Amino acid sequence: MQFPESWLRTFVDPQLTTDELSHALTMAGLEVESLRPAAPPTEKIVVGRVLEVVKHPDADKLNVCQVDAGTGATLQIVCGAPNVAPGIKVPVALVGAKLPPAEEGGAPFAIKLSKLRGVESQGMLCSARELKLSEDHSGLMILPEGTPVGQDIREALNLDDTVFEIKLTPNKADCLSVFGIARETAAITGAPLAAPDIRPVLAELTETLPVKISAPDLCGRFSGRVIRGVNARAKTPHWMVERLERAGQRSVSALVDISNYVMFELGRPSHVFDLDKIHGGIDVRWGKRGESLKLLNGNTIELDETVGVISDGAQVESLAGIMGGDSTAVTLDTTNIYLEAAFWWPDSIRGRARKYNFSTDAAHRFERGVDYSTTVEHVERITQLILDICGGQAGPVDDQIVSLPQRAPVSMRASRANRIIGVEIGEDEIAQIFTRLGLAFERDGDVFRVTPPPHRFDIEIEEDLIEEVARIYGFEKIPARPPVAKSEMRATDETRRSVHAIRHALAARDYAETVNFSFVDAEWERDFAGNDNPVRLLNPIASQLSVMRTTLFGSLVGVLRHNLNRRAERVRVFEAGRVFVADPSVKAGELAVEGYAQPKRIGALAYGPVVEEQWGTATRQVDYFDVKGDLEALLAPVPARFVKAEHPALHPGRSARIEVDGHAVGWIGELHPRLMQKYELPHAPVMFEIDTDALVARALPAPSEVSKFPPVRRDIAVVVDQKVEVQALFDEMKKALADDACKFVQRVALFDEFRAKSNTSGGLSAHEKSLAFRVTLQDAAGTLQDETVDQAIQTLVDRMARVYGARLRG
């Protein structure tokens, strides 16, 4: 937001210097990025009147001018500007004057007594560009007729004015105007605010333009009026051009300048249509697929049902709240106009300009929220300026209200405000702050019930009001105190470990931590979670980050692709983050949003060689069992079951559901071949995702006696049907450990699998497989006898034979 200080002080004039005012605004949250003079330093440049103009005797493009510069003697100045004429008033650089340098950092341009083609020139007539006031170099800068001859140009044009540039946060849409800044300045400093004097314009016509609002979710209020007989060629007043240019807006034409001026003055974007180019009435509606519109910037865009438009009986005329169309644009030949000012719902404008790769001042304001109570008032203001400058006759204001925001009161507890701000602010002082801010409130004890005004779209919760109290009270008045807390030793819960410890454990297993956005592409949710109805964001920062994730798999694959694109060959990453799942059973709370569960999960991905390449070890790609081993180490000493199951993101034959104590806690497996092909991955990564709670919980360590006697190891090979899962056999052997005969069994591990290549290979049928297990037994009290070991092995085999038809391989 850029504006001249002189414009601001027409609304509020605190007894502060420019620097003090800048500091006050910054400390109240309106950061002043820069202060710069309206014009560079100049010397001996005054207002002069051209008395006579004659052709140069020796140059076709030069004129010899007689100029009254208030010096007491007429000056002869040679000038080549095409618009020089007797009677005009222009800036005159006297001999000895210093003009701003032509290039930044250069030396000032000194004016000397000189001869041009043999004719003496006693100075120079200046253009706006030569004074560094604008880029206009089409001719001399012509000053208003009432400007005193001989007056210093800095005084005549207020060139010692200061231009403020303020960096506004997105919530401060109410400050996107000079009056909005003035309103804040009055609240901050206590200086009186002079509101603009806007009076209704007398309607000399009865004509109105038929308006239909077909989309109340697009436009809540639409105000407009017909004005006939305007002179579009009228010259914009110098004072308006000056303010616009110092606000960063170049002058275009009187009608356009007036619309822009009121936008900068009051914060209300408006649009002026050429009435004679409108076919019938206008309809405010959503666009339709297949429609197109040529905009004022010359671009032709394709419309759809997500963007709002203003159309007439023949075609679309404007991109609602963003930019007008070329077909109804005003020109210098326009004589009849339709003036429009509306309230557009912020959600209906937000992101639409970015969709077409451009931005406008109107969209910037409307997508943040513009006062919906002042559309008629602003139409009256624009109308009066048009009639004053361009003439014409106005019709009545047609004001249609279909749906406006319902502003519910927001409660703030004074006690909580004091606790958060860290300083005691009295309730009466809080009441004064709200009054200065123009916030209507009711008091009930220490509770303030504030009704947000129509121009404040940023006040929704208690913390918003606390922020208002803090910044108007003054951040500088809040003492800097070090935090004070009790220093006490708390007992450590040995049945739980921190997520920080889990992250360290993964890092120790050669996984690098990554942090990703919780919002992802909707396509990722379909691919990696099979979710066609994700939690959608109301205001995504980008179209590819429009939904909340329900799995970490997509984020991890995204990191993998990023690294592969940079020639990484081995990638092992993990993330500890939240996912967001719709769950009607979740109630609202301090850290909960009603209807949405936000569990924290740990996800990891391994890709490429198992270990870095080295001369003593053969290179092989990481597989399911490598990552399964990492996960088992992470869960230890808690045993986990890996049950064959299918997940949308994982290979149907190489994936499993992770279960702990009979509860599903996560997934593990290779990436689905379909996704591997879609995301152009040379090899399949292996991934797992598990609830953090399953990793955090752990049993108390129980010391056990270390046996003095050696363990006994026996290998058994059993033949089972190929459909029998190894996990099922492990489950049965685990049940057998409850038998007294198996009390010395310490561990059972699979070390080999064999499948027949033909019907008679290895004594196996085509539908059978051989599984080899290594059983470790140990007794802490003595050496195990062969009879005891044989009995334990036989018990395990009998159990598998009874349930799954297993037999010992001969």
From Swiss-Prot:
CC terms in the record's Gene Ontology section: phenylalanine-tRNA ligase complex
UniProt family annotation: Belongs to the phenylalanyl-tRNA synthetase beta subunit family. Type 1 subfamily.
Catalytic activities: tRNA(Phe) + L-phenylalanine + ATP = L-phenylalanyl-tRNA(Phe) + AMP + diphosphate + H(+)
Keyword ATP-binding found: yes
Organism: Burkholderia mallei (strain ATCC 23344)
Name this protein carries in UniProt: Phenylalanine--tRNA ligase beta subunit
Gene Ontology molecular-function annotations: ATP binding; magnesium ion binding; phenylalanine-tRNA ligase activity; tRNA binding
EC number(s) per entry: 6.1.1.20
Location of the FDX-ACB domain: 707-809
Subcellular location: Cytoplasm
Keyword Magnesium: yes
Single GO BP term: phenylalanyl-tRNA aminoacylation
Cofactor remark from the record: Binds 2 magnesium ions per tetramer.
Chain residues that bind Mg(2+): D458, D464, E467, E468
Cofactor: Mg(2+)
Residue ranges of every copy of the B5 domain listed in the record: 405-480
Keywords from the UniProt entry: Aminoacyl-tRNA synthetase, ATP-binding, Cytoplasm, Ligase, Magnesium, Metal-binding, Nucleotide-binding, Protein biosynthesis, RNA-binding, tRNA-binding
Quaternary assembly: Tetramer of two alpha and two beta subunits.
Family annotation (Gene3D superfamilies): 3.30.56.10, Bira Bifunctional Protein, Domain 2, Ferrodoxin-fold anticodon-binding domain, Nucleic acid-binding proteins, Phenylalanyl-trna Synthetase, Chain B, domain 3
InterPro entries linked to this entry: aa-tRNA-synth_II/BPL/LPL, B3/B4_tRNA-bd, DNA-bd_dom_put_sf, Fdx_antiC-bd, Fdx_antiC-bd_sf, NA-bd_OB-fold, Phe-tRNA-ligase_IIc_bsu, Phe-tRNA-ligase_IIc_bsu_bact
Domain tRNA-binding as annotated: residue spans: 39-154
Uppermost EC category: ligase
